Structure formats: structure tokens, C-alpha cells
From Swiss-Prot:
The keyword Cytoplasm applies. It comes from the Eukaryota. This is Vimentin-type intermediate filament-associated coiled-coil protein. GO terms for cellular component: cytoplasm; type III intermediate filament. Expressed in brain, heart, kidney, liver, lung, skeletal muscle, spleen and testis. Within the kidney expression is pronounced within glomeruli. Residues 7-98 form a coiled coil. Residues 126-171 are annotated as: Disordered.
Amino acid sequence: MSAPPPLQIREANAHLAAVHRRAAELERRLLAAERTMRAQAERLACQDQQLRAALDELGRAKDREIFTLQEQLLSSEATVRSLQAAVEQRDQMIQELQPRADLLQDITRQRPPLAALLATLEEAEELGPLPSSHSHGAQLLPDGPGPPLGNSMREEEGQDDQQPAVFGTTV
């Protein structure tokens, strides 16, 4: 075997050096890529952990808010039931008081004529009794009623104590 020519040896050495440099470059790039991937994986794991913690906190906050809203709903429903009971009670009271209200309305409608009648009666009382010459056994008006009767209210008050009259035969 003969030795390769020096040019071939130099070319082969240059080629080996280039392959060696290329391999070293690729190893450096591979190490850099691995470091980058590890750093990204760590960042992603950290972000994932942060997002999971935030998601858990949101879940707890949602559960607290749901609990609060359920309590408010129960309270509101109790208030509604209470108010409905109060409305029913007031409606019943209104139905019970309506006849009295109707009566009071009738009284207020009839009040002006009654007031006028009372004023007229007061005027009549202020006129006083008739002179005594006309009141003894004489009629005030021809073909009219006899002398006015006294106030019968005093007589009726005393009748409660008297025995009632019994009609029929006595034995």
C-alpha cells in the first residue's frame, strides 16, 4: 500500500477538521437548544402552576359568591313570603273594614243635610215656647194638630223601671 499523496492528506485533514468544527457547532447549538427548552419548560411549568393557582382561587371565589347569592336568594324569598302574608292580612283587613268605610261615606254624604236640620232645630229651640194663653186646650191651627207635646225622652227614660202593661183578663 502506498501512502496517499500529501495533497489528499491535507484535503482529508481539512475535511476532518471541517466535520469536527461542524460537529462541535452542532453540539453547541444542541446544548443551547436544550437549555432553551429546559428554560421554556420551567417557565411553562411555573406559568401552569400560577394559572392553576389562579383557577383554583377563581373557583373558590365563584363558590363563595354562589353561597352569598344563595343566602341572599333565601333571604329575599323569606322577605317576599313575609310581604305576601302582610298583603293578604291587609287585604283581609280591608275587606273587614270596607262596610264601615261605606257607612262612613254615607254618613259624610248625609252630613250637610243633617247639619242644616240641626241648625233649624236649634233655631226652633231659641224661639222658645208659645205664650201660655194659646197652649191651654186650644188648637194652634184650625183643623190642625193639637198643642205640641213635651219632650217625650224624659218620660221614656223612666219607663224602664215601670212594669209593662199586661193585656188580657185578670183572675
